[in-house]
Amino acid sequence: MLNYTVIAFIMLGLIAIGLAIGYFLKFRLSQKRLESSENLALRIIDEAKKEAETIKKEAVLQTKENLLKLKAEFEKETRERKLDLDNLERRIRSKEENLDKRIDSMSQKENAIEVREKNLLSKEMQLNEKHDKLSRMIGEQKEKLEQIADITSEEAKDFLIRSMEAAAKRDAAMLIRKIEEDAKREADKKSREIIAYAVQRYAGDYVAENTVSVVNLPNDEMKGRIIGREGRNIRAIEAATGIDLIVDDTPEAVVLSSFDPIRREVAKISLERLITDGRIHPGRIEDIVKKVRLEVDSIIKETGERVSFDVGVHDIHPELINLLGSLKYRTSYSQNVLQHSIDVAHLTGMMAAELKMNIKEAKRAGLLHDIGKAVDHKIEGTHAAIGADYAKRFGESQRIVQAIAAHHDDGRTNTLLGVLVQAADTLSAARPGARREMLETYVKRLEELENIANSFNGVDKCFAIQAGREIRILVGSEKLSDNDAMMLCKDIVKKIESELTYPGQIKVTVIRETRVSDFAK
């Protein structure tokens, strides 16, 4: 027990000694650290002082440099402003010198003008004196002339005016004739080039149309079936289609006759289907005719759409499309009107291209120009007026309407588009073989043309040539002068336009010739 107590005291003593030693060591260490920190702080303060001194010196140097730089810039700017002021001063001095010179020049001119005015006033006074003297002399001479010529001055003036007026009229007539001749030559040359180019580029095919249709039969026995009991089938066909069915001695064929090609086409298709079907009686005839009529209407519409597409004319009203398609079954002097309209559209477009005009508009006017022929048998009036009315009604432009209305009337053609349509219409109709007319009508038209020319005084002979498209008139040189011949030509043209109806245009040529003959003995 005692040993443990001793050990415990010893242990406590050792611990106390260790604590004392540790405290002493810690105290000494703290003192060393404090001394080290103080030394470091002193060192930092010294370095900071040195750095502050360096910064201060640098700041002073920088400030001095900036001051020097600002001083240099100020001196430079001052020198530049001084140079500008010197230049401005020189310009001002130069302007002052110029102004002084101009003032001196103006003063000299004013002096010269004053001198000139004085001279002019002096000359004016001299001229007035001479004018008065001349007036007195003219009056004296005038009195002497009136006494010698036994005529007053007013009468002499009237005679002189009449003479000058007659001479002026002669000169004016000669000038007008020369201008017209030059214009006609140039216009004829240019129009021939354009027309020749258009015709060379477009040559449409054409087959003459007939006013009858022939339906072939498988045998002659079919004629009896077509006639029917007591002719009832023929009467039913004629009543349903509006055509004349002719059954004659022609073997294995019957003839359909009608002035209306659409009716004739309906009758032809209907009869062919009846022959193929074999059932020919009034009830069946009516059914077939109704179906065929609807099919023909559809064909007309398709034809109009196809033609407008082929020609390149779009956005046409459906009613005008139907009228255009129906022209397939119309003829004019045996020429198919639809093919004629296509020809006119192409020719008009080509001539418009040569003249730098709107090609689409020209083709449109050419294609629709004869649209009135589709309904002219139903409505009173000329086909041109009817066509223009329909075109206006269904939304065509005013230029198109005018071209349609005036394509057969020179007097109303006041637009270049109308002239082109008229020229293309004449070209298409005037081609050899394009149209045919009855000999009696042809001869009558030529006689009327020659009678109009012979009705004027001074006409010796006249000849209608080129199928009535030109008339040549011979006049005597002793009866008419050149100016009278020109006026005669214009009068004949006006009378032909007012009294005759003709396609295209008629050229009137007046020939005045002088013949001199003598005999060698």
Curated annotation (Swiss-Prot):
GO terms for biological process: mRNA catabolic process. It is a single-pass membrane protein. Its EC number is 3.1.-.-. The chain crosses the membrane at residues 5-25. Residues 337-430 form the HD domain. PANTHER family: RIBONUCLEASE Y. This is Ribonuclease Y. It comes from Syntrophus aciditrophicus (strain SB). The lineage of its organism: Bacteria, Pseudomonadati, Thermodesulfobacteriota, Syntrophia, Syntrophales.
